[in-house]
Regions:
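Catalytic cores of alpha/beta
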Residues: 39, 119-123
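A short acidic, helix-capping loop that chelates divalent metal ions and anchors anionic groups
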Residues: 140-145
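Non-cysteine beta-strand/loop elements that form the S-adenosyl-L-methionine
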Residues: 52-59, 130-138
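Conserved small/polar residues in nucleotide/adenosyl-binding loops
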Residues: 156-162
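N-terminal capping/small domains of soluble enzymes
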Residues: 2-104, 111
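Short loop/turn motifs at secondary-structure junctions
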Residues: 47, 128-130
Length: 166
């Protein structure tokens, strides 16, 4: 058998991640793709296994002051600072946009405190999304982000109540 004998539709690329069936294992990295609308004219979102959104917080964040992005030899550096519209606008605008596509929705949840993360998780509980990703690794915010990821006590205070909510 050679590659011309294989019909693309005959290949099952589906995967199960945390109990959620995806049609394929391809998603975008959180923070690089907005909430999908920004790239929908260039990328067929229907072909992705999931869209992982940019971080979403309890309230809107302006992010870090400019400049936020710098080109360096072989790549780019960024310190956007989790700019986002806040959970209410995200639920009103971005989730309905993403629901138009045949792809899973993974919402990246961020915050400055455990309470903010929990507020976002509670707000998302009744929304038609497939998964949540808890962002405890963003290095360019003063509170939250990597501060949670590098402190096991903070991490436990954040993740345990969040897991119990879901």
């Amino acid at each position: 058998m050679n590659s011309s004998d294989i019909n693309k539709t005959d290949i099952n690329m589906s995967v199960k991640i945390a109990g959620v069936e995806w049609k394929n294992p391809v998603t975008v990295a959180s923070g690089t793709f907005g909430s999908g609308a920004e790239y929908s004219e260039f990328v067929d979102l229907n072909k992705l296994g999931a869209v992982t959104t940019k971080g979403v917080a309890d309230k809107p964040w302006e992010g870090n002051p400019t400049p936020r992005v710098a080109e360096v030899y072989g790549g780019m550096l960024n310190a956007v600072g989790l700019q986002n519209p806040g959970i209410e606008l995200f639920c009103k605008r971005d989730i309905p946009f993403l629901k138009k596509y045949d792809t899973k929705i993974v919402v990246n949840v961020c915050g400055h405190s455990a309470e903010e993360y929990i507020n976002v998780v509670k707000r998302l509980a009744d929304e038609p999304i497939d998964m949540m990703e808890i962002n405890i690794s963003c290095p360019n915010v003063k509170e939250g982000g990597i501060a949670f990821g590098t402190d096991p006590v903070s991490y436990t205070h954040l993740t345990l109540p969040t897991i119990l909510l879901v």
